Amino acid sequence: MPSKAFETLPNIYLVGPMGAGKTTVGRHLAELLGREFLDSDHEIERKTGATIPWIFEKEGEVGFRTRETVVLNELTSRKALVLATGGGAITQAPNREFLKQRGIVVYLYTPVELQLQRTYRDKNRPLLQVENPEQKLRDLLKIRDPLYREVAHYTIETNQGAARDLAQKILQLILSNKLK
């Protein structure tokens, strides 16, 4: 049963590359906190009635990022939420501002090898539909890692335990710093 102490915590936002486990860890974290869990990519699909690959195909990445910013502004304005963001959400300055100013941001750092292992069969990741997905992941991480670190209040490595354990570790880290 969630503690009363959790009620005073701000929203918690998970950022990181595709395959980091943001959705899985986020669900466990929300369960520990007794909070609603949302995934921004799922919310974009729900609100538009279109899949992310379709949006990328018809509107390009720019169109998708525009939709993503609208949804993130809306979601980060809510309360008592654990939110998993899309891997590229931090590429847009307004999104970084929404996240950093409206809650606690946790960067789930994931080595490229683990990202590849977790995503190589997933056809719903438009940015990986290329000849060399491993190189694409390396290129994305090189660009995005500094942005994840810029926005994050905490960084956790995801190759250190199961999703439930990572959620517990995140909660302990946040609570121990809140008590200081």
Curated annotation (Swiss-Prot):
PROSITE patterns: SHIKIMATE_KINASE. The keyword Disulfide bond does not apply. Its cofactor is Mg(2+). The keyword Transferase applies. It is an enzyme of class 2 (transferase). Pathway: Metabolic intermediate biosynthesis; chorismate biosynthesis; chorismate from D-erythrose 4-phosphate and phosphoenolpyruvate: step 5/7. Binds 1 Mg(2+) ion per subunit. One of its GO terms (molecular function) is ATP binding. GO terms for biological process: amino acid biosynthetic process; aromatic amino acid family biosynthetic process; chorismate biosynthetic process. Substrate binds at residues 41, 65, 87, 144. Its EC number is 2.7.1.71. Keywords: Amino-acid biosynthesis, Aromatic amino acid biosynthesis, ATP-binding, Cytoplasm, Kinase, Magnesium, Metal-binding, Nucleotide-binding, Transferase. GO terms for cellular component: cytosol. It catalyses: shikimate + ATP = 3-phosphoshikimate + ADP + H(+). Its main location: cytoplasm. Mg(2+) binds at residue 23. Catalyzes the specific phosphorylation of the 3-hydroxyl group of shikimic acid using ATP as a cosubstrate. Belongs to the shikimate kinase family. Monomer. PANTHER family: SHIKIMATE KINASE (PTHR21087), SHIKIMATE KINASE 1, CHLOROPLASTIC (PTHR21087:SF16). This is Shikimate kinase. It comes from Acinetobacter baumannii (strain AYE).
